[in-house]
Swiss-Prot record:
Originating gene: trpA
Name used for this protein in its record: Tryptophan synthase alpha chain
Species of the source: Francisella tularensis subsp. mediasiatica (strain FSC147)
Record EC number: 4.2.1.20
Main EC class the enzyme belongs to: lyase
Keyword set, alphabetical order: Amino-acid biosynthesis, Aromatic amino acid biosynthesis, Lyase, Tryptophan biosynthesis
GO molecular function: tryptophan synthase activity
Pathway(s) it belongs to: Amino-acid biosynthesis; L-tryptophan biosynthesis; L-tryptophan from chorismate: step 5/5
Amino acid sequence: MTNRYTTLFANLEKRNEGAFIPFVTIGDPNKALSFEILDTLVSSGADALELGIPFSDPLADGPTIQEANIRALESGITPKDCFDILTKIRAKYPHIPIGLLLYANLVYANGIENFYQKCLDAGVDSILIADVPAHESKEFRDIAKKVGIAQIFIAPPDASESTLKQISELGSGYTYLLSRVGVTGTETAANMPVEDVLAKLREYNAPKPVLGFGISKPEQVQQAIKAGAAGAISGSATVKIIQNNISNKQKMLNELTYFVKEMKAATLN
């Protein structure tokens, strides 16, 4: 089902826009509110969703997303609940690309093929396994291909040419380009320039590069698009809005709406 990404990027290109993709953890802060949050993100103008399934040991995540995982797990969320929420959001929004960003342990625990099939059945378009680099991804890649899900790879800013070439050849859907090395979070702002990496990815005809890590302000989205990225992903900044408004649902949803609208507006060239 990579067609949703292909269609999205083609439509955005026609309109001279970039993609704004928020990331949140499914089930944060609880099951009922999680669906409303996803619904708000899409209805406010998100071009695609990147979502986490709560896991007790999120290696690449900074404190903000780790806390989101803890909140979701403490509310009693299960992988089955996550798939229910995904199915519901897919039914409401048939065209939006939905990606999962998770860790290998979670996939192994469910059996790789079984997990990918469940994802497909719930309407998921892509899977990015944060702790599996492209050169170690064969068992996941093969099943992704068989099932019909796009396998996304991370392109680090300090990647060698051969790594970038491999990511370009093996990936599908989009390429997750890191704006810097380290763990996620807005504590450390994204540091451009990534023009050189973007030029290489273009040369190798990689899936569309989307910039992530430390993206929290509209001007960073603007910079990313200007540098040649097809879009920007914002995780910690989105999750922080949830964290800061746990006891005030309406304020949370209002702030998420404002944030998405502002970030999306920055993708318009």
